[in-house]
Amino acid sequence: MATETETVVEETEESVQQIPMIEANGLSKFYGIFAATREVSFKVFKGEVVAFLGPNGAGKSTTMKILTGYLSPSQGVARIAGFDMNTDRLAGSRKLGYLPETGPLYPEMTPYSLLDFFAEARGMNKATKRYRIEKAVDLCALNSVIYKPINKLSKGYRQRVGMAQALIHEPDVLILDEPTSGLDPNQIRGVRQTMKRLGQEKTILLSTHILQEVEAMADRVVMINEGRKVYDGKLEDIDPTHQGLDAVFANLTGLDAETGVKLDNEIDED
């Protein structure tokens, strides 16, 4: 029989587990009469890897920019680790690592000098910088290229450098926008391996329009189409009739999973 102390500890751990590390609450973004997103709501909890899936033009990047504080919502609230990213962005940013689709890389720098620059900008002392850089380099498997100019690296390695930059301050939350975009199969495998390592200790939201990425890296999927959320659930629950994820995606969005085409209309780029 559990003691009173053990019961309190279990309840405390359970309550911590239920605090959302990423929260989108009714997020809408309007440009004149055009709505990039409409009332998008979802939560990502500690230890989850969640795929944010949708065709190009669905509103994924807009939602991620709002979640990271780079864009203010027209309506709704975005929170990181409980901090409102519109009114308390600095506190939220300390908990957040963000990799946009085009990462903040300086081609003339080496991965080491870039990471040192970002660590310095975050006010780390010499010992902390050394430790954080070594840890980020190990997590992202950059040891073999750490002193090579970034403009000499493959796109796969540049993507890993971007991830290392997002990790330099040891954030609890990672938001990654199309982390495998434009990579070849070998580079994609490398990024997937990095994601598996990171998923053991971080809360991760990654956007993608590639169904295979969801199956390879995520525990749960949030699906968006035409600016609206159309699905939010566990991977094991999304396909109870075993049609395959392609068929489920087509049923929910009305789009062909491979071409992104609805009837005869091309989907615009995000």
Model-derived regions, located:
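A short, surface-exposed alpha-helical micro-motif characterized by mixed small hydrophobic
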Residues: 214-216
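Conserved ABC ATPase "signature" region
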Residues: 116, 120, 127-145
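Catalytic Walker B motif of ABC-type/P-loop ATPase nucleotide-binding domains
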Residues: 174-178
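Helical segment within the ABC ATPase nucleotide-binding domain
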Residues: 188-200
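A short, proline-enriched helix->beta-strand linker immediately N-terminal to the Walker B motif
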Residues: 168-172, 201
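ABC ATPase "signature
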Residues: 232-233
